[in-house]
Regions:
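Short, low-complexity disordered leader/linker segments with a strong preference
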Residues: 1-50, 76-77, 124-131, 331, ...
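Hinge/cleft segment of the Venus flytrap/periplasmic-binding protein
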Residues: 40, 47-49, 179, 183-187, ...
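Hydrophobic alpha-helical segments within soluble ligand-binding/sensing domains
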Residues: 45, 51, 94, 150-176, ...
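Extracytoplasmic "Venus flytrap"
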Residues: 50-70, 74-78, 84-100, 112-117, ...
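Short, solvent-exposed amphipathic alpha-helices that sit
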Residues: 62-81, 158-162, 186-205, 223, ...
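Short beta-strand elements at the ligand-binding edges of bilobed clamshell
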Residues: 85-87, 142-165, 178-180, 210, ...
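Hydrophobic alpha-helical
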Residues: 95, 102-128, 195, 213-278
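Flexible loop/hinge segments that line or gate small-molecule binding clefts
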Residues: 117-157, 273-281, 327
Length: 339
């Protein structure tokens, strides 16, 4: 009798085990996994979201290094993405990279354009292929219907804020060495435009020289050294990024020309690298204009909306930015805003 009962019990346990093994997957507890999925933008079929990211060379500047690092930290497999990156400071090479990403059938194309023009055709190709385009960092000259959103800096405002600050210094005359970034980029156009307008409108604003150093410190140093060697007088360095300002200062130091607060030459830069803000804090530079490189979280939020069938709340997001004056900057500013 005991043997019969034991046999019946064993059969019952086996039957119960089989029933558990055949239980449908969708009946398992899902609350925790659902919460996690809402945080990471997985595609509707559960696959990773394929993203092609076109950016400028990370070695271009401290700003670009921070921007690239921010993007790489966000667009990971852990966050639901399969991301590929392409880098160039040349528009034609970036456009070729975009065409390659279209052929690779990415889901999203993220672009920080080297130049503002020439993008219409490739964006039309992306649209025809059903690929969503998101601009970051810089604007382009293209119809807004060709991209779903843009998260960018207002480069014209950056330039105007800097020029307004310079005008507030009340110099009798402004003799300016203007060191430009890569010509045709949104950053160069915006930061140059405000200064050009101010020089054109005021007789006591003079452009001693205006040349591109293409964001490069060594080239900027050569430009300033050439002006020093020519014997032309100047009292302002307006450099369109921190690295070029650093190169300009190297030429001043070599020639024993004082610079900074209360000195012979006003030094201005853009990007707010931490080391540059420390130069302001020490009084060696006078002004630095912020350019916020941290766009990745905004892009991620937009992609989440699109994956959930929602239209982004804003077509264009302008990054919050400010300018810093050596006479008012604090260590807290350096710690909070330095990149």
């Amino acid at each position: 009798m005991k043997k019969i009962l034991a046999l019946l019990l064993a059969i019952t346990m086996i039957a119960a085990f089989c029933a558990c093994a055949q239980k449908p997957a969708d009946t398992t507890p899902a609350d925790t996994s659902a919460d996690t999925a809402s945080d990471a933008p997985a595609a509707s079929d559960g696959k990773l979201i394929k993203v092609g990211i076109i950016n400028n060379d990370p070695n271009e500047s401290g700003y670009r290094t921070a921007n690239d690092k921010d993007l790489k930290a966000m667009f990971t497999e852990e966050n639901g993405y399969d991301a590929s990156f392409a880098y160039s400071l040349k528009n034609d090479e970036q456009i070729a990279a975009a065409q390659k990403f279209i052929q690779d059938e990415v889901d999203y194309l993220l672009i920080s354009a080297a130049g503002t023009s020439g993008w219409d055709s490739v964006l039309q190709d992306a649209q025809a292929a059903g690929i969503q385009v998101i601009l970051f960092d810089r604007t382009i000259d293209a119809d807004e219907s060709l991209y779903v959103a843009s998260i960018v800096s207002d480069m014209a405002k950056e330039g105007q804020t800097a020029v307004d600050w310079l005008a507030s210094q009340g110099l009798d005359s402004y003799n300016i060495i203007h060191i430009q970034g890569v010509m045709g980029s949104a950053a160069q156009i915006g930061r140059t435009g405000a200064l050009d307008a101010q020089v054109a409108a005021n007789d006591n604003w003079n452009m001693v020289t205006q040349q591109t150093a293409e964001w490069n410190a060594e080239t900027a140093q050569q430009i300033v050294q050439s002006v020093i060697d020519s014997g032309k007088e100047f009292n302002v360095i307006y450099a369109e990024n921190d690295d070029m300002a650093k190169g300009a200062v190297a030429a001043l130091d070599k020639a024993n020309i004082s610079h900074g607060v209360g000195k012979d030459v006003i030094v201005m830069g853009f990007d707010c690298n931490k080391w540059a803000l420390e130069e302001l804090l020490a009084g060696n530079w006078n002004y630095d204009g912020q350019c916020n490189p941290f766009q990745a979280s905004y892009i991620d939020a937009i992609i989440k909306d699109l994956e959930n069938g929602k239209t982004p709340a804003e077509k264009t997001i302008i990054m919050d930015e400010k300018g810093f004056d050596a006479s008012t900057i604090t260590q807290e500013d350096v710690d909070n805003y330095g990149i």
